[in-house]
């Protein structure tokens, strides 16, 4: 997925999260001709999702207008996370759109938000925290119920289909 210069600079400044104890998953989706992979940890409180990547291996013809429509539809569909999603960045030539929580979660020490990056053949879902004191951005787990996880996987699959 080709990122805009702004998004690339931003992504380069996000530190990887500490996801020890998370299980890696990898599924082949024959119908979609793609793969679903990521890492998560299940507990009594639900699921902590480190990251999920859905990639379609058979390229699909897609205009930027259609990609934007899919991103807008996804932002409306994914209404079960703690914050609503809005388009914050896009790149017409690179066929890339970034959704983010607006407004994000804030407290005295940090700001956290969900981020979904949508490309022509790839979708990445993750949660990022900005720690004010250290001025550091780091990937953190996204807390979901099992039902929310299944719905999220269904919704991103529909967006890339």
Per-segment meaning from a language model:
Residues 48-115:
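The feature represents the first ordered module of a protein
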Residues 122-161:
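Mixed-charge, glycine-accented linear interaction segment located at domain edges/termini
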Residues 30, 101-106, 127-132:
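Short acidic, glycine-rich loop/turn motifs
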Residues 11-12, 29, 45, 89-91, ...:
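Acidic-enriched, low-complexity/disordered segments with a strong bias for Aspartate over Glutamate
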Residues 1-78:
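Charge-rich, low-complexity N-terminal segments
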Residues 10, 17, 71, 103-106, ...:
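Residue-level detector of solvent-exposed, low-hydrophobicity positions
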Residues 108, 117, 140-144:
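Short, well-structured alpha-helical patches and their helix-loop capping segments
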Residues 35-40, 111-125, 152-153:
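Short, structured motif recognition centered on aromatic/hydrophobic residues
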């Amino acid at each position: 997925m080709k990122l805009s210069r702004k998004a690339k600079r931003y992504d380069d400044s996000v530190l990887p999260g500490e996801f020890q104890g998370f299980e890696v998953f990898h599924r082949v989706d024959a119908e979609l001709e793609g793969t679903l992979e990521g890492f998560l940890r299940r507990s009594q409180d639900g699921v902590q999702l480190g990251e999920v990547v859905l990639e379609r291996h058979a390229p699909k013809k897609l205009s930027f207008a259609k990609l934007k429509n899919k991103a807008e539809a996804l932002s409306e569909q994914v209404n079960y996370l703690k914050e609503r999603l809005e388009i914050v960045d896009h790149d017409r030539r690179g066929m890339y759109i970034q959704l983010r929580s607006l407004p994000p979660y804030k407290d005295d020490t940090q700001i956290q938000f969900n981020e979904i990056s949508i490309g022509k053949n790839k979708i990445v879902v993750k949660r990022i925290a900005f720690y004010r004191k250290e001025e550091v951005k780091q990937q953190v787990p996204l807390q979901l119920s099992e039902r929310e996880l299944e719905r999220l996987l269904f919704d991103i699959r529909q967006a890339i289909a």
